[in-house]
């Protein structure tokens, strides 16, 4: 697939997500969380292209959190943002030391790291008056999270494309919800984004998400529709076919 075709495909699915879930309204100030990875770069690049087209009237701002991880170097990232003329701020907060101190060796850091990062993001968005917080999770993240929740937490849940935070002060959006990771990888390579690797997570083996990712990949080899069917299932729920007592009063369920 050519460079333009990949970009066109991704923009199509981002616009579909924006419209299906009314993610962005006229006049919104959208804070895009830029981690330095392929997904967040792709999200920011595509939203910027859509903004420049002019059909969607909104402003974007890139928020970068430097968590003081060893080897972090954002000089190329700064250059890329300056070149694109995208306003941004890089905030330094040492969550790395906290995670290393609290999590025993050999255990996964992702949960605590995410909680700390989320608190900082919410606080910054509120202080700066942003109406939307855009995250770079894509289709594969959503379906992997679904299986992870079932397998390891005993819950049927995932990542919604649009979410009101628990404190009801922030609206989170995931414009890449329909986009496949393989297309994002191609796009990121073509755009030559100056990626910043996450040394904290990348050094850990056998993460749950990687195992679930391999499982879905293996199933897709037998039936290519498996990933798309899983995504479709997230918006095609049949509550009467489940066994949640909060949805149905099973004890009183009888024929009239």
From Swiss-Prot:
Enzymatic reactions: cytidine(32) in tRNA + S-sulfanyl-L-cysteinyl-[cysteine desulfurase] + AH2 + ATP = 2-thiocytidine(32) in tRNA + L-cysteinyl-[cysteine desulfurase] + A + AMP + diphosphate + H(+)
GO cellular component: cytoplasm
Cofactor(s) required for function per UniProt: Mg(2+); [4Fe-4S] cluster
Subcellular location as annotated: Cytoplasm
Species annotation: Coxiella burnetii (strain RSA 331 / Henzerling II)
UniProt record, GO biological process: tRNA thio-modification
Function, as annotated: Catalyzes the ATP-dependent 2-thiolation of cytidine in position 32 of tRNA, to form 2-thiocytidine (s(2)C32). The sulfur atoms are provided by the cysteine/cysteine desulfurase (IscS) system.
Pathway membership, UniProt: tRNA modification
Textual note on the cofactor: Binds 1 [4Fe-4S] cluster per subunit. The cluster is chelated by three Cys residues, the fourth Fe has a free coordination site that may bind a sulfur atom transferred from the persulfide of IscS.
Family from the record: Belongs to the TtcA family.
Miscellaneous comment in the UniProt entry for this protein: The thiolation reaction likely consists of two steps: a first activation step by ATP to form an adenylated intermediate of the target base of tRNA, and a second nucleophilic substitution step of the sulfur (S) atom supplied by the hydrosulfide attached to the Fe-S cluster.
Enzyme class: transferase
Name of the protein this chain belongs to: tRNA-cytidine(32) 2-sulfurtransferase
